[in-house]
From Swiss-Prot:
Residues 92-124 form a coiled coil. Keywords: Coiled coil, Membrane, Signal-anchor, Transmembrane, Transmembrane helix. This is Small integral membrane protein 23. The gene is Smim23. It is found in: Membrane. One of its GO terms (cellular component) is membrane. Residues 1-31 are cytoplasmic. Pfam families: DUF4635 (PF15466).
Amino acid sequence: MTIQKTGCRGREAAEVVEQRRRSHHCDDRKQTLLALLILVLYLGMGISGSSWEVSGQTKDCNHFQNPVTPQGFEYQTKEPAEEPLRTLRKWLKINLHGFLEKLEKEVRELEQLVRDLEFWLDALLGDLRPEDPCFT
């Protein structure tokens, strides 16, 4: 009888968890995480001092270099890229608050999922006590 009672509560808890998981907007989360990843990578390049440069010279590798190859294939930007930084700052001012709200919402949803999981585990394992016949 106890097993059926626990099974019913466990099933109800599992249904609640499954409903929350289905109602979650997975695409929105993926887009947010992708945008954050791109933002972190872009800011990381700016902070580390790396610039967008492509060089035709391969001095540090062990490949054979043809001396006839023209050296005009070098493209390097030595000047700071102010326009992309200005654009990024403007975009951050506009969208950072929205990202923060989405992240806070994600944290609240994860906390709720943890509470649901704790409830489900309590419902599933809560009635089992050492004096039950299963433990003898």
